[in-house]
Every structure is written in C-alpha cells, then in structure tokens.
C-alpha cells in the first residue's frame, strides 16, 4: 500500500521544468519536429499506434517526442488521449483481401497468384552500421514502373480452403456481438474475438517472447507463415441516419496468417489450422508473434495437450498489456512508508524473540555447571 504525501509541489514543478529541458537537449541542435518523427521513425510510430489503440500517426509522433523516445510512455500518453474522444460507432469489418499491397511474402508457396513482393524490409540487409546516414548522404529513389497499377491479390490460404485442407474460417456472424476489451474487463475463458483484441494491443516484446517459447517446445504447433502482407485497407462507416456505407479513409495494416499442423480429432479430420495476427502500420514481428500466440491459445478448443505458458489464457491475457504492467511495476517508486515501518516493527520483534531463544538454548543448566566445576577440579589435581 502506498499513501498520499503532503508537500513537494515545488520539487515536482522543478522536476517538470528539468524534464522539458532534458527533452529539448542542446539548444544549438535543431529541434526534432513531429513531422520528422512521423516520416523517419515510422516503425516506432506504428508500434505506438498499435499498442495505444489509436490510428493517428501525427499524435503518435507527438507522444514519442513528449516521452523522449520512451515508447511505453508514449503508448500511455496516446491511450490517455484516446479516452477523451467521443465514440460514434463501429466501422464495418475491413476486407484485408482487398488490401493495396506494399509487401507480400509467403513461406509456404513460391509461386503465388499476384506474386511475392519484397517491399521495404530489413530481411536481407547485412546489419552493418551505415555511416552514410550519419553524414546525411542523399538516398537513391526506388525503382518505379510508370503507370504501375495498385497490387491487389487473393489470400494464400484461399487455395488450401478450396481443397478443404485447412479449417473453415471462424469469422463471427454479422449479428453476433463482439467484445470490447477497452470497455469490459477480461473474463475467462475468453472468446477468440476478445483474445485477438487483447493481443493486438499487447506488448510486442511480451508477445515475441511467448511466440519464441512455442518454437522451443513449450506448446509447439509447427507453424508455417502462410502469408504476411502489408498495405492499405479502406475503412467504411455506416451511419444509422444514412443506411449505407461511407468511406472514411484508409489505414496501413500488417496481416499474418499462420498455417499450423493438426492431427485431427474424433470430430475433425486431419487438417491445417489457423493462427492470425493483425496490427496497425508495418509491424511484421508483432503480427507473426500474435499469430503464434493466437494459435497456442486455441489448444484446448482443438483438444490438444495444454500446460505451456503461451497456451494459458489466464497467464497470457492479464500480463500482455504494457501500460498496466508499467503502472504496477513502477508504482513501487511511490511512497510505501507505512508498509515499510510495519515491516520494520515486525522484523525487530522477530529478531528480539530469536535472540531470546538463542540465549536460552546456549545458557548452561545447573547440572552442566557442576560437571564443569568437577572437571576443573580434577584437572587441578
């Protein structure tokens, strides 16, 4: 338990001023603009939007600047701002199959309808520091094909679906209510729609560790990356007073469909199963990790053995939110004076009782004293 502390307002005000000074850095260096962060630190912006549950690159960039680059603090800032926004309703389900693709790869099929598109990726870089970036050397323009149309391609799993080799998509019916982890507390067991929401806004590092654990034998499902795609998807909203869909714009998404082995059961034939990941922006690592953990959490419903951490809803879901985790861990910095004084009183009492017991155990009895005197007398003779 921590308690309120009186006083310290002047110190807190001074700390805020010092924080602003440290955030600005050397005044001789040009100030870092929100536009620069948005355009040149886009992957950090994407993570803040994803885990902050708010798609707004400018606000995410502002949060990163305000947090001095601490992404979890930036996520906290964005979520706090999100709570002040009015909610007009839900958008229509997005059709990621109509995504305007910037990157698309598959680890299961070499030749795909629509082809594989490497796009912007670190996958084949040599991981050597580029001194040219420090010197501000101009970057070559990417190769472009004049008049190149936007690329739209069908999903890879559609090919397996037509052959009945993969489980049917369990997309909820349009009239079935969907949970909302931002308004309703988690309950167990959680349905898959709730789990996917929690995973989508969960901490990337925690998901990465859980996904990695499944590859080291703790809930292994032998996954294949069926398809990873990144691109823009249109968002539609249907106002009640209009009765038809209105386009609101587009968002950049990364989608991962993982294909996993399944030996079958008494009610289901041997077939592939699905793991799914979908996140804001370009964030393949998180989308892959999300798909791995999604599939691991389905072990019980598929009749598989459970016991691994990644398969336990009550371990995964309550612990993957980095804002909650940060609040609980960092609250240890707050005053705990009363608790600690109580611990001190208890410890001193226990020490006093222990010392008394030790003195009693080591104090010689009357018989022992007589034996000692007799031994000394015999030694003197």
Label every model-predicted segment.
Residues 1-50, 99-119, 123:
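N-terminal, Lys/Arg-enriched amphipathic/low-complexity engagement segments
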Residues 2, 6-9, 52-56, 70-78, ...:
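Proteins with a high burden of low-complexity, intrinsically disordered sequence enriched in S/T/G/P/A and R
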Residues 34-58, 63-89, 93:
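Hydrophobic alpha-helical segments, chiefly the membrane-spanning helices
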Residues 76, 95, 106-109, 113, ...:
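A ubiquitous, low-specificity "background" feature that marks scattered single residues
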Residues 87, 93-153:
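Helix-turn-helix/homeodomain-like alpha-helical modules used for DNA recognition
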Residues 143-381:
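Acidic, serine/proline-rich low-complexity intrinsically disordered regions
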């Amino acid at each position: 338990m921590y308690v309120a502390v009186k006083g310290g307002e002047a110190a807190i005000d001074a700390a805020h001023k010092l924080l602003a000074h440290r955030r600005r850095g050397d005044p001789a260096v040009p100030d870092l603009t929100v536009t620069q962060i948005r355009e040149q630190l886009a992957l950090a912006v994407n993570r803040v939007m994803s885990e902050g549950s708010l798609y707004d690159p400018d606000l995410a960039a502002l949060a990163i600047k305000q947090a001095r680059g601490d992404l979890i603090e930036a996520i906290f800032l964005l979520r706090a701002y999100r709570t002040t926004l009015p909610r007009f309703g839900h958008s229509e389900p997005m059709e990621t199959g109509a995504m305007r693709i910037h990157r698309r790869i598959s680890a299961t099929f070499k030749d795909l309808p629509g082809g594989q598109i490497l796009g912007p990726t670190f996958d084949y870089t040599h991981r050597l520091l580029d001194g040219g970036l420090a010197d501000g050397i101009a970057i070559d323009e990417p190769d472009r094909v004049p008049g190149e149309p936007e690329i739209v391609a069908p999903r890879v799993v559609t090919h397996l679906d037509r052959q009945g080799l993969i489980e049917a998509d369990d997309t909820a019916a349009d009239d079935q209510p969907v949970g909302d982890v931002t308004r309703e507390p988690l309950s167990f067991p959680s349905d898959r729609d709730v789990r996917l929401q929690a995973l989508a806004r969960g901490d990337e590092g925690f998901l990465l560790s859980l996904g990695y654990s499944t590859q080291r034998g703790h809930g292994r499902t032998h996954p294949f990356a069926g398809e990873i795609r990144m691109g823009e998807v249109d968002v539609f909203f249907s106002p009640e007073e209009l009765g038809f869909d209105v386009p609101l714009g587009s968002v950049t998404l990364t989608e991962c469909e993982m294909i996993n082995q399944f030996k079958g059961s008494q009610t289901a034939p041997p077939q592939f199963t699905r793991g799914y990941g979908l996140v804001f922006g370009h964030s393949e690592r998180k989308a892959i990790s999300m798909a791995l953990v999604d599939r691991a959490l389905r072990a019980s419903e598929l009749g598989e053995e459970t016991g691994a951490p990644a398969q336990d809803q009550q371990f995964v879901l309550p612990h993957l939110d980095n804002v909650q985790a940060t609040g609980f861990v960092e609250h240890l910095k707050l005053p705990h004076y009363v608790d600690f004084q109580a611990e001190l009183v208890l410890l001193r009492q226990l020490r006093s009782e222990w010392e008394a017991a030790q003195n009693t155990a080591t104090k010689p009895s009357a018989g022992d004293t007589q034996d000692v005197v007799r031994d000394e007398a015999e030694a003197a003779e």
